[in-house]
Amino acid sequence: MLRRSLAAVLFVLALAACGGQESSTPATQAAPTQPAPSAAVLVTTDCGAKVVTAKTPVDPGQTAMRALDRVADIETDSGGKFVTGIEGVEQNTGKKLAWLYYVNGKPADKGAAEVKLADGDVEWWDLHNWEKECASVPPDAE
């Protein structure tokens, strides 16, 4: 009987010694997943009034021209340096309509073959009168 009592006391002490202590091994947690880097291309006419190609994700690191070519059927001039048509919608020099492009809502200052898209960039192409700036930028183009 004494053995049983002693065994029971030792068992209770062992349980008490284990309780209340945090494990020294850290819990394994999955690292939060980061969204894949992405840029986007949007094509409109009349300063965003009509959507030709909805905002489409593309991989960053490629040129604006390459990204456009991947999401739309394009026609170019001058050895591929100038866009003259997108998805069958052609420029019209008689009406002073040209395809102009913007990055993050700002007019591009280089040719599309020279500008590389970064993560988060939005490339917006719009067919409008080249003598006028668009008064506003479509929400999807910023």
Give the location of each predicted region.
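Ubiquitin-like/PB1-type beta-grasp interaction modules and other compact soluble beta-rich domains
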Residues: L2-V12, C18-E142
